[in-house]
From Swiss-Prot:
GO terms for molecular function: heme binding; metal ion binding; tryptophan 2,3-dioxygenase activity. This is Tryptophan 2,3-dioxygenase. Pathway: Amino-acid degradation; L-tryptophan degradation via kynurenine pathway; L-kynurenine from L-tryptophan: step 1/2. It catalyses: L-tryptophan + O2 = N-formyl-L-kynurenine. Heme binds at residue 264. Homotetramer. The keyword Oxidoreductase applies. Its cofactor is heme. HAMAP family: T23O. Binds 1 heme group per subunit. Keywords: Dioxygenase, Heme, Iron, Metal-binding, Oxidoreductase, Tryptophan catabolism. Belongs to the tryptophan 2,3-dioxygenase family.
């Protein structure tokens, strides 16, 4: 009941993060009440916990060092977490490709931006691995056998999805029929950029038939008709805003990918110099050659033409 002459009292409101508990108007010390702690659920015997949801038992039990060296745990976790980020990158890129195929560009922009941020995360991860010295790596290297990041089938699918196709890169996966089928499907399917070039054609640009009907298993090469289309987009961005935004999202993505490649080669040089890689490649020399790969050639060359 309201007391005459006094302002009306408002009913106490429950904290939106308090699981329905009514907020007290008097501050109380943060202490264990005996029945719980800050209203948090503490009994998960009949409900799903954080660890259950994330399958942490499986994830955190997936590190099996083969050497007695302390630093091998870093090496394993560096690569396992990178594979998890690559899984998400593939998930987003494939969804973005399908969105472009349906002419739904705004969702594709969000997904591409997310992939670029994933690449930035992967770039920063090299700084952690770079804390391993040559002496530390030498102690554990014999235990790696011929295993190498060169054999990462998720990374290979990202390369293929971004247009850097090479049929020879199927061979490292021939011993796993399931993986081989997955990587081969990525090789034979149109790349993300191929789908964007199709989009240009659907938007009325005169893309050559040879470009639209090319062999999807081959790497992306410069095409004059595609560059002419992008030149028109960049000269009149307000008239082709979605295509303009798509172009810039792709440049952001390749820029981040180039940074990842650069940090990869410098980290390898820092740790093993110019020794042969465990997978049989020339190591840093091979990685330096990969720095010259251009994924979206017309988008870079058009800047010179403007």
């Amino acid at each position: 009941m309201q007391t005459p002459g006094l302002p009306e009292e408002k009913p106490a409101q429950g904290c939106p993060f308090g699981h329905g508990a009514v907020a007290s108007s008097v501050a109380t010390p943060a202490a264990d009440s005996g029945d719980g702690w800050h209203d948090a659920q503490l009994d998960f015997s009949e409900s799903m916990s954080y660890g259950d949801y994330l399958s942490l038992g499986t994830v955190l039990d997936a590190q099996h060092p083969l050497s007695p060296d302390h630093n091998e745990m870093l090496f394993i976790i560096q690569h396992q977490t990178s594979e998890l980020w690559m899984k998400l990158a593939l998930y987003e890129l494939r969804a973005a490709l399908q969105a472009v195929h349906r002419d739904e560009l705004p969702p594709a922009f969000k997904m591409l931006a997310r992939v670029s941020r994933i690449m930035e995360q992967l770039v920063q991860a090299w700084s952690v691995l770079a804390t391993m010295t040559p002496s530390e790596y030498t102690a554990m290297r014999p235990y790696l056998g011929s295993s190498s990041g060169f054999q990462s089938y998720q990374y290979r699918q990202i390369e293929f999805l971004l247009g850097n196709k090479n049929e020879q890169m199927l061979k490292p996966h021939a011993h796993r029929a399931d993986v081989l089928a997955e990587v081969k499907a990525s090789l034979e399917a149109p790349s993300f950029y191929d789908e964007v070039v199709r989009l240009l054609a659907r938007r009325g640009f005169a893309i050559s038939a040879a470009r639209l009907e090319r062999d999807w298993t081959q790497p992306t090469v410069h095409d004059a008709s595609v560059e002419a289309a992008w030149l028109e987009v960049y000269r009149n961005p307000s008239q082709h805003w979605e295509l303009y935004e798509m172009a810039e999202e792709l440049v952001d993505l390749e820029d981040a990918f180039r940074q990842w490649r650069f940090r990869h080669v410098t980290t390898v040089e820092r740790i093993i110099g110019f020794k042969q890689g465990t997978g049989g490649t020339s190591g840093a020399t091979y990685l330096r050659k990969m720095l010259d790969v251009v994924l979206f050639p017309e988008l870079w060359h058009v800047r010179t033409m403007l």
